[in-house]
Amino acid sequence: MLKTPLYESHIAANAKMVDFSGWSMPINYGSQIQEHNNVREDCGIFDVSHMLAVDIQGSEAEKFLRYLLANDVAKLQENKAQYGCMLNHDAGIVDDLITYKVTDEHFRIVVNAGNRESDVAWFNQNAQNFDVAITPQTDLAIVAVQGPKAVDVIKRVVTKEIAAEIEALLPFSFKFFSKWMVARTGYTGEDGFEVILPTTQVKKFWDSLLENGAQPAGLGARDTLRLEAGMHLYGADMDISTTPLERGLGWSVDLSDEHRDFIGKKAYLAKKAQGVDTKWVGVVLKTKGVLRAGQEIDFDNGEKGYITSGSFSPTLKVAIGLAYVPKQADNPVVNIRGKELEVELVKPKFVKNGKSLI
């Protein structure tokens, strides 16, 4: 099993370790709900070094990424980040990614842990006709510092000059400090930062954050936080067999430049013209019970929907889920232990900055 540079720190903190995409990762440090609530109210830190930063450099870096990705990196200013999907030729989602623009000739992409090898292979396969170099940065670690007090904590562990620059970062912007990259991004629905730094320096940084008020959080809390925020998890909410249209991600596909071609565009436009017969929704179970991935949602006209992610929401204290359902259907119910329980369909976003949206 693969280990991140912080593996020994997790063991020392009595973390419960699990296999996540071939990596030994902390699922929690004792209480998933406490870790979740701490991120909503204070500051939690996550080791996400199982994800991979890949640098795309060269005179045709922008041209290549405009072809590779469904969102348009030409819209990005330097030191800005963008969410988007990478599609195959059938418009199936290969991965969802954050792309960071350093300069016109240098971009950084962070890919999901389960797709590290396949994504890099896809980059290389499609880069052959472009003047670009693709460099997986395997000597970098990634730490997410998340929560309303994230900025206070991170300011305590850096110099005053750097603290001022970090505090001034806008959402989806970033800055390099030597080999460290600090981005105001995250996967929790809270303010926070993702810090990409050399593996040789990550333990000292992690320990400094803990000494200055942060609490560690595992992948369990990361999952319930992102679910409350309505953020997709690759492999659960979407995969290679689904297009952005079917998963509420059409907003991330940029069609504004009709002259730009990108992988999957033709198939995507055909699917868009044909229309999809499902919609992407949030699901709330008002009574006791738990929503889980794979559960069916039944409607009174006989049609069905399916939950792709589900859990108890520590913030809302009810069970919530993400699902795709028929566009026209009424009176949704789920079957839990032989009982039909009513669910409410809502917008697929439940919590923002600690506050309920439902």
From Swiss-Prot:
Asked if the keyword Transferase belongs to this entry, the reply reads yes
Gene3D superfamilies xrefs? Aminomethyltransferase beta-barrel domains (3.30.70.1400), Aminomethyltransferase fragment (4.10.1250.10), Probable tRNA modification gtpase trme, domain 1 (3.30.1360.120)
Q: Which Gene Ontology terms describe the biological processes this protein takes part in?
A: glycine decarboxylation via glycine cleavage system
Q: What gene name is listed for this protein?
A: gcvT
- Biological role stated in the UniProt entry: The glycine cleavage system catalyzes the degradation of glycine.
Q: Which family does it belong to?
A: Belongs to the GcvT family.
UniProt cross-references to InterPro entries, sorted A to Z: GCS_T, GCS_T_bac, GCST_C, GCV_T_N, GcvT/YgfZ/DmdA, GcvT/YgfZ_C, TrmE/GcvT_dom1
Write out the GO MF terms: aminomethyltransferase activity; transaminase activity
Q: Which domain of life is it from?
A: Bacteria
**Assembly and interactions?**
The glycine cleavage system is composed of four proteins: P, T, L and H.
Which reaction equations make up its catalytic activity? N(6)-[(R)-S(8)-aminomethyldihydrolipoyl]-L-lysyl-[protein] + (6S)-5,6,7,8-tetrahydrofolate = N(6)-[(R)-dihydrolipoyl]-L-lysyl-[protein] + (6R)-5,10-methylene-5,6,7,8-tetrahydrofolate + NH4(+)
Which Pfam families did the record assign? GCV_T (PF01571), GCV_T_C (PF08669)
Q: What is its EC number?
A: 2.1.2.10
The name under which this protein is listed is Aminomethyltransferase
Q: Name one GO cellular component term.
A: glycine cleavage complex
Q: Which UniProt keywords apply?
A: Aminotransferase, Transferase
The answer to whether keyword Transferase applies is: yes
Q: Which residues form a coiled coil?
A: none
